Amino acid sequence: MALPAAPADRRLQPEPDEQLHLNHQDIGELGLPQEPDTEGIPLHSPWTFWLDRSLPGTTAAECESNLKKIYTVHTIQSFWSVYNNIPLVTNLPVRWSYHLMRGERKPLWEEESNAKGGVWKMKVPKEASSLVWKELLLATIGEQFTDRCAPEDEVIGVSVSVRDREDIVQVWNGNASVVAEATVLEKIYELLPNTSFKAVFYKPHEEHHAFEGGRSRH
């Protein structure tokens, strides 16, 4: 799916400290429609933007309570409305993350619709984080990974997490048992040939030591 160019942005500016105060009032001020958007070029499926802060040692309940839903987009136009009006990745404080998930699923390992899947995880230089995030978002909503997954699998999300030295990008899939058939990483390298990825690996959610078998963290 070819996506139109982004309109001019009007971003919220984050607080200067380690707290990013993007509350429901702020989200309302983004100028997004209050009802699901139906006008414009439809996406193949809806996608939901999420924001959270990840801290070591948090419980599953704390992880879920830290999640803040930004908006569910149904069209290319509403995607750009959200993307252009939330703080840049480079303005997020350390340990904060953005996620874009298929439908309204949450970026939690044990969410029922996620539990059998996993993520391709990689470190990226901070100066490349914004470009990598944008390109992976566009590839994801444009369904460019469809023919790179096994027939019984799909990409269900993408995340970017800010860390001290290098940031972390993750691409989520729904079925870890068939990941050997996937060429998702090859597609990522094709999309971003000039990016130096480090510590690249795939990990099923169920192999995380903190996987709780119910609903948990990311």
UniProtKB/Swiss-Prot annotation:
Pfam families: IF4E (PF01652). The keyword RNA-binding applies. The keyword RNA-binding applies. One of its GO terms (cellular component) is eukaryotic translation initiation factor 4F complex. MRNA binds at W109, E110, R163, D164, R165, E166, D167, I168. Keywords: Initiation factor, Protein biosynthesis, RNA-binding, Translation regulation. Residues 8-21 have a biased composition (Basic and acidic residues). Recognizes and binds the 7-methylguanosine-containing mRNA cap during an early step in the initiation of protein synthesis. Belongs to the eukaryotic initiation factor 4E family. This is Eukaryotic translation initiation factor 4E type 3-A. The gene is eif4e3-a.
